[in-house]
Structure formats: structure tokens, C-alpha cells
Amino acid sequence: METRNIKRCEYEIGDVLSRVDGLVILLAKYRDRFFSFRQYANEDLYLADLAKYKRIQRAGINVPKLITHDREKKVLIFERFEEKKALDVLSVEDLKEIYFKQLFNIYRFCRFSKIEIDYMPENYILKGTTLYYIGEEIIDANPKRNLENYGLRYWIYSKEAADHLREKGFAIDAKRIISEEEANKRIVLLSVTYW
């Protein structure tokens, strides 16, 4: 097994979790704990992701903790959660109210910080009673991409959510798909309740 030494800690490197332009995310282990080991091809991408993490964290959004970073080796190491993503849960059952309460808390932090993040449910993990954002996107505030106008529809079993689940390779339960009218009512009710 390959090992990598980052700031006097020796990480056992496992499977490749993701590979995108200029970035490889690997599963890493140190003292019986698992981490996301992010290796960057260039310093600009490394610095951009580090700045993105700091900006999201300053906004008050729960994200996996940055355990360590090494600019020379262009590595960021984050804590790793084994819990299911919100999209995985939605594929088998409706999301519980705790998800929506936490999601609107995140949305509130985004609004106050004048930023938007990716509100699609595959970018969130519920650990205990805390929802964590595990997505990559952070942009300046954009009313067309906010939770109410863009993302919330994918958190309930609407036609859009079913199409999205199908695109991601999940089986669809046609009996669970709610009508457009019911989806709109649910979105308004969630917004009134938690905003």
C-alpha cells in the first residue's frame, strides 16, 4: 500500500474517489480514521480550493473540516463522512424535516454572506442532526440560483427530482412523484416554515 507523509503524519493511500481536471481525490487512512486526500496538479487550483473552503467556512456553512494542508506538495486533507448523501436518502424515502430545517439554515448563512452554493441534494450529508455541504461550487449571490428558485424542487420527490435521480442512475418510483401543484405547495410551505 502506498503511503504519503504530510506534515509528519503518514497517510495510507487507498482508492481513487474522484478525478477531475487537475485534481485527484483519494481515500486516505491515518490511525483508523478515513480522510479525503486531495492532490492538485498545480498551485493555482490548490490555492483556489483553499480560498473556496475558507470562504464557505467564514459564511458559517458546515463543511467537512480541513485537517491539514501542504502548499509545497499541493495537498488538502479533509475529514470524511460515511453517511449517505441526501440524494441517496431521497431515492428510497422522503427526506425528514431535519434536512429542510438545516438546509434553510445553510441558505440563511448564504444569503447573509451574499453567496450561493450548489443546492442539489447530492452535495449534502446529514451527520447526526447536522447537514454538511460537501459540494465544490461557491459563487456570488444570484437570485436565479438560490434555494427557493433552483434547488428546493430537487429535495422533494417532484418530477424534476425524479428526472435528476434517473440521470444519476437511481430507480424511480412513479407512485411517489408528486404533481406540479403539490410540489409548489410543498415549496411554499417549507419556505414559510423554515425561512
Each model region followed by its residue ranges:
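Hydrophobic residue at the +6 position relative to the catalytic HRD Asp in the kinase catalytic loop
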Residues: 119-124
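ATP-binding glycine-rich loop module of kinase domains
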Residues: 10-50
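Protein kinase-like catalytic core scaffold
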Residues: 35, 62, 76, 132-134
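C-lobe/activation-segment region of protein kinase-like
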Residues: 112-115, 127-195
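Conserved hydrophobic "DFG−1" position in protein kinase catalytic cores
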Residues: 27, 39, 68, 77-80, ...
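Structural motif at the C-terminus of the N-lobe alphaC helix and the adjacent alphaC-beta4 loop
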Residues: 51-62
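Conserved structural core of kinase catalytic domains
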Residues: 61-102
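A short, low-complexity linker immediately N-terminal to eukaryotic Hanks-type protein kinase catalytic domains
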Residues: 1-13
